[in-house]
């Protein structure tokens, strides 16, 4: 019996195509049907979740506020009237946007203490505002947003909207900040 795994079909020019790359493990087969939804792994973020959309919308609003000088009320009104978003997304995005701006005087020092080599005003606008949203959630949304979720969401959003190393930077800063907030899971043990 021969090993067919390295036998490649010639392409139109008669050349052999390279072997497909992969981990060599077959994908697990999941049953389809009622109750067979795949489980999310540790650290997975569902990109279409309501809260994820709200955080993204809040980031865009904070970014606009930071860089354009548009009025806070103008941005907030537009945020609340975005018909493309469900009301739950608009409501939570507005909570984050207004909460971050209201509490900037207490949020920015937390970030500055965790990253003393990087003055908050000099941080990239995306990184700065992702961190602000995460710190706001850690301080004021702990009943509905677990510590790990706030951190993982911030990292994912930083990866999606920030520079190449934004995810790592946000992860490091929030790792330091998170020590100030005991994790409910660990506290319950």
Kindly give the residue locations of the regions a language model identified:
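N-terminal interaction/assembly modules
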Residues: 1-167, 171-189
């Amino acid at each position: 019996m021969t090993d067919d795994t390295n036998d490649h079909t010639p392409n139109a020019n008669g050349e052999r195509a390279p072997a497909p790359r992969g981990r060599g493990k077959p994908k697990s087969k999941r049953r389809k049907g009622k109750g067979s939804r795949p489980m999310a792994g540790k650290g997975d973020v569902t990109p279409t979740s309501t809260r994820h959309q709200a955080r993204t919308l809040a980031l865009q609003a904070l970014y606009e506020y930071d860089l354009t000088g548009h009025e806070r009320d103008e941005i907030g009104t537009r945020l609340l009237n975005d018909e493309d978003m469900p009301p739950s997304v608009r409501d939570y995005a507005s909570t984050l946007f207004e909460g971050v701006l209201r509490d900037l005087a207490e949020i920015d020092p937390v970030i500055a203490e965790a990253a003393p080599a990087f003055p908050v005003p000099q941080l990239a606008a995306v990184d700065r505002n992702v961190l602000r949203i995460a710190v706001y959630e850690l301080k004021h949304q702990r009943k509905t947003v677990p510590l790990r979720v706030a951190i993982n969401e911030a990292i994912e959003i930083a990866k999606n909207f920030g520079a190449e190393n934004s995810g790592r930077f946000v992860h490091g800063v929030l790792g330091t900040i998170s020590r100030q907030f005991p994790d409910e899971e660990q506290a319950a043990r």
